[in-house]
A protein has these predicted regions:
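Solvent-exposed loop and capping/linker segments of extracellular ligand-binding repeat ectodomains
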Residues: 4-633
Length: 633
């Protein structure tokens, strides 16, 4: 027990960011009372116990509510109207934080039905940043958790790999505005009714999460997508023949056209228990047309090499088209499905000479991109998909599958200037090639979240310009690599004006220009990453934070020996910067040229005690700043 007067450890509490003024209620069904605590805008915690009429908390737009609880469950039952204690009210909000803070910070789910109905019909809009940390679930733990949340557009990630009976049953039933869900439900062993009715009535959902399990069990997918009237893509891996026993009415009421990817499985069932009637079975690249218009296939330059692809709208009749500087144009209606294949080994010969999709139609890309390379198992030529979707109206690529291999420049500018793109594909490769992701998402101004980047070994220019000018990007991917290469992160996030926090940068030995211009003009960046490296390289940090006008404190710079141009223009134009710690013992101007130009007029510079030759000015210690000798903690 915490001693009296001991400050409570701050945690990632369940948090509501209020979008519209109103009330948040803490309600319960009869005899289902539960006590929790809340605080508003960081003030004092207050205990409240749910009532049948609801304890009301008045909130204004932009208020922040935080919640915590010591309960093992919230009293919900396995009925669609079986609420226990739950949130309600008139205010709309985004939910974030770690849900375990409602369960006494338990590392494991403490009970069955633990979080059942917790947000039943609440006005939550986004749960994208709500963390459901449990990898092993209990029976009915998330049963009807968001049932009837008609404002919900974005669901949380669902990382659990060990399921339990009824664990996700009806979790999002009736979420009629839900459009974004996990692109994969990772569990490979199913339990009875585990996903039954999970997305029942989610009438705006277009693409289902990937279902990797190979074997089915009683009602595991029963009514899973019932009345998902816009659903047009399902990717499964099960070899069990679907039937009333496993998949009863799972695709009743889905869209009339769609793509079903069986991963090569041999079962053959159509209708409401299998592949929806009217859908095409295909594993390769497909476009789901979301807004009517044209799809074009164009050659960027007459000096380039024309490339041929084939398309089909029925899965049996294929039409070949060859790129030209006057684009080939095909008209489609909203809801149409277009399958694509090709026999080329590359669709560009350089960054200037490429064939690309374009047109006026908005579309989602799904399936395996390798159908364009004759279903090869790996990329065998540079520039393979260079600029393939450049400046097109692609909206989502979250279900587009890319290979685990890379090749030099293979994804160069693949989605460059796709201003409608909101979700990126997974990038599974761990062995990279030079310039493989160069400019891949540059100028994707609607992209808010970057894909994971799992590689731990960098190669030359691998992520150079990758997210440059992605002005809506709020979350950067983790960058775990400790082995860097020349220009590997060069310009990676330049102009990402919505980025507030940088990823950790654990490397202790650097490479030439490795972080050069990495966060230039990230004007919302308030927190810089630690920079632990003591072995620097030429231009390693040059211009790294240039123009980061919200940055107030520089990361500690522990290196005692500098390299040529290592800190050149590093904090240039960081107008809020007022604290720098640099432990260099010697320098010349070109190592720190204009590194502190146009920073705050007053501040503190902490230096190595043995360093006595720092000059005043933008290429040394800013005039008007206090100078303090560094002391070991």
């Amino acid at each position: 027990m915490m001693a009296s007067g001991t400050p409570e450890i701050e945690r990632d509490w369940l948090k509501f960011d209020i979008l519209t003024a109103g009330t948040v209620l803490w309600k319960c069904a009869t005899n289902k009372e539960r006590t929790i605590s809340y605080r508003k805008n960081g003030e004092k915690w207050t205990k409240i116990t749910s009532t049948t009429s609801g304890v009301s908390i008045s909130v204004a737009k932009d208020d922040v509510l935080e919640f915590k609880g010591n309960n093992a469950d919230y009293g919900g039952t396995r009925k669609t109207s079986g609420q226990g204690s739950y949130f309600a009210g008139t205010a709309t909000f985004n939910a974030s934080g770690n849900i375990s803070t409602m369960l006494n910070n338990s590392e494991t789910l403490p009970a069955t039905l633990a979080l059942a109905h917790l947000f039943h019909s609440a006005k939550v809009v986004s749960a994208q940043d709500l963390i459901l940390p449990y990898m092993t679930l209990t029976s009915s733990c998330y049963y009807a958790m968001f049932y009837g949340c008609t404002n919900l557009t974005t669901a949380p990630e669902l990382p659990a790999t060990t399921l339990a009976d009824y664990c996700y049953q009806y979790m999002f039933r009736g979420c009629t505005n839900l459009v974004s869900v996990s692109n994969k439900l990772p569990a490979t062993t199913l339990k009875n009714y585990c996903y039954s009715g999970m997305f029942y009535g989610c009438s705006k959902l277009v693409e289902a999460p990937y279902l990797p399990a190979t074997g089915l069990v009683s009602n595991c997918y029963g009514s899973m997508f019932y009345n998902c009237s816009k659903l047009q893509y399902i990717h499964t891996n099960f070899s069990t023949t679907p039937s009333d026993t496993y998949t009863k009415t799972w695709v009743t009421g889905v869209a009339a056209k769609g793509v079903f990817d069986k991963n090569g499985k041999t079962w053959n069932v159509t209708g409401v228990n299998g592949v929806p009637t009217g859908w095409l079975e295909y594993s390769g690249l497909a476009f789901i047309i979301t807004t009517a218009g044209t799809i074009t296939w164009k050659l960027s330059n007459a000096s380039g090499t024309a490339k041929t692809v084939s398309y089909s709208t029925d899965g049996s009749t294929w039409t070949s088209i060859t790129s030209a500087t006057t684009a080939v144009s095909i008209s489609f209606s909203a809801g149409d499905v277009v399958l694509w294949k090709g026999e080329e080994t590359q669709y560009a010969t350089s960054s200037s000479y490429y064939s690309s999709f374009g047109g006026t139609a908005y579309f989602d890309a799904v399936g395996n991109i390798m159908s364009l390379l004759n279903n090869a198992s790996s990329i065998t030529n540079q520039y393979a998909f260079c600029s393939l979707f450049r400046a097109s109206r692609i909206c989502s690529a979250s279900h587009l599958r890319l290979p685990t291999s890379t090749y030099s420049y293979c994804y160069n500018s693949m989605f460059r200037d796709c201003i409608s793109l909101t979700t990126a594909p997974e990038l599974p490769a761990t062995n990279l090639a030079s310039s493989c992701y160069y400019s891949m998402f540059m100028g994707c101004t609607s992209l808010t979240t970057a894909p994971e980047l799992p590689s731990r070994i960098m190669v030359k220019n691998c992520y150079q310009f990758m997210f440059m000018y992605c002005s809506s990007l709020t979350t950067a991917p983790e960058l775990p690599a400790k082995t860097l290469a020349q220009s590997c992160y060069d310009y990676m996030f330049r102009g990402c004006t919505s980025l507030t926090t940088a990823p950790e940068l654990p490397a202790k030995t650097l490479a030439q220009s490795c972080y050069q211009y990495m966060f230039q003009d990230c004007t919302s960046l308030t927190t810089a990453p630690e920079l632990p490296a003591t072995n620097l390289a030429s231009s390693c940090y040059s211009n790294m934070f240039n123009g980061c006008t919200s940055l107030t404190t520089a990361p500690e710079l522990p290196a005692t020996t500098l390299a040529s141009y290592c800190y050149e223009v590093m904090f240039y134009g960081c107008t809020s910067l007022n604290k720098v710690t640099c432990l260099a013992t010697s320098y010349n101007r070109y190592m720190v040229n204009y590194w502190l130009y146009n920073v705050a007029s007053t501040g503190t510079f902490i230096k190595n005690v043995s360093m006595t030759s720092w000059p005043s000015g933008a290429s040394g210690i800013p005039e008007g700043w206090d100078v303090v000798d560094y002391e070991e903690e």
